[in-house]
Swiss-Prot record:
One Pfam match: Peptidase_M50
Binding site for Zn(2+): H18, H22
Location in the cell: Cell inner membrane
E.C. numbers: 3.4.24.-
Listed transmembrane segments: 52-71, 97-119, 285-307, 332-351
Name of the protein in its database record: Putative zinc metalloprotease RC0203
Main location as per UniProt: membrane
Catalytic site positions: E19
Protein's organism: Rickettsia conorii (strain ATCC VR-613 / Malish 7)
Length: 358
């Protein structure tokens, strides 16, 4: 029950924030907003404000939308004259671009605010990139890494924290990573191929959670630093960028077949994680919201027709060429985008069901 409640609350918060971004910028540019909906299907409750916007909560809590006047004229009442002053498609390319981009960007803004709050309040704890132990029969042992070795670079990128090492290896995925090691004041380079392992968290019933490892354990020491507002904001932005890079890398590896689509989670997976984060307390839940918000913002920026990113591409095409995309071409691309989204939804739900009964 906690998972169901957590899922509804979490999705409602993220969808509201996302759609509110579209709403605010549309209103700023004097574009008429007709509806603001949390959920799909039959309206459970609704109210119409003085500006004529119908605010409602619908039966199926799997998303939401803002109905913007003039967004798609093919769906408008042909018997009524269009009010060009408040129509979306009568605005400039820049104004339309900002309206469409506002949803994903406000998701990023929410995540940055939450992360910044945590950094300012709790500070930052860094674990030096020094190896404390090497796992037997691991890639690290085969590469002759030893306790006390300091990792200076990963794939030519300097690392200052053990988390940096983990991130760079994960971003590189199943490809070999190049580590610059400092041992007794001497530096040398090793190439190491991570191995895929299956982990079974104690609280989980299924055992099909996959991750990558090279088999090193950090030395048991840490450095805690207090961070001011500007420092917290900077760290929050970097954290958001790192999370986006990891997600994009995972997507690209799935496309080329280096990672399995089994890793895609659907509503049941989100519901389970929502329940666990709520049970873990306010701090854990806020971090969960921030991480989901990053992913929601990023996924909506992907150049897939029907998503915000796809519409941004159409607007950019118009801005560069001075011409609207051909209606037939646009419709074909929108249908293709819908097929891609439906395909991903089927995979996500299928994975959820499989994990539920595994």
């Amino acid at each position: 029950m906690l998972s169901i409640i957590g899922f509804i609350i979490t999705i409602s918060i993220l969808v509201f924030i996302h759609e509110f971004g579209h709403y605010c910028i549309a209103r700023y540019f004097n574009v008429k907003v007709e509806e603001f909906s949390i959920g799909f299907g039959k309206a459970l409750i609704g109210i119409t404000d003085k500006k004529g916007v119908r605010w409602k909560i619908c039966l199926i809590p799997l998303g939401g939308y803002v109905k913007i006047y003039g967004y798609d004229r093919s769906l408008m009442d042909k018997t009524k004259e269009v009010n060009e002053k408040v129509a979306f498609d009568a605005k400039s390319c820049l104004e339309r671009f900002l309206i469409v981009a506002a949803g994903p960007l406000i998701n990023y803004l929410l995540a940055i605010i939450i992360f910044a709050g945590f950094y300012c309040y709790f500070g930052k704890t860094e674990i030096p990139p020094i190896i404390g132990n090497v796992v037997a029969s691991s890639p690290a042992e085969r590469a002759d890494l030893r306790a006390g070795d300091k990792i200076v670079k990963v794939n030519d990128k300097s690392v200052k924290d053990f988390g940096d090492v983990q991130r760079e290896i994960l971003i590189n995925g199943f490809s070999s990573s190049t580590l610059t090691i400092e041992r007794k004041s001497e530096e040398f380079i090793v190439n190491i191929m991570p191995q895929e392992i299956i982990i079974s968290p104690p609280e989980e019933k299924q055992v099909n959670k996959k991750t990558l490892r090279i088999g090193i354990i950090a030395k048991n020491e840490s450095i805690h630093t207090k961070i001011g507002i500007l420092g917290g904001l900077w760290e929050a932005i970097n954290t958001t960028i790192d999370m986006s890079a990891l997600t994009l890398n995972a997507i690209s590896q799935m496309i080329v077949g280096k990672r399995s689509f089994d890793e895609i989670g659907g509503p049941i997976a989100i519901a389970k994680e929502s329940g666990k984060s709520i049970a873990g307390g306010t701090q854990m839940y806020l971090l969960f919201i921030a991480m989901l918000s990053v992913n929601l913002g990023l996924l909506n920026l992907l150049p897939i027709p029907v998503l915000d990113g796809g519409h941004l591409v159409f607007i950019l095409y118009e801005a560069i060429t001075g011409k609207l995309p051909h209606p037939k071409t646009k419709n074909i691309l929108l249908q293709l985008g819908a097929i891609i989204i439906i395909f991903l939804i089927i995979i996500a739900v299928s994975n959820d069901i499989q994990n539920l009964f595994s």
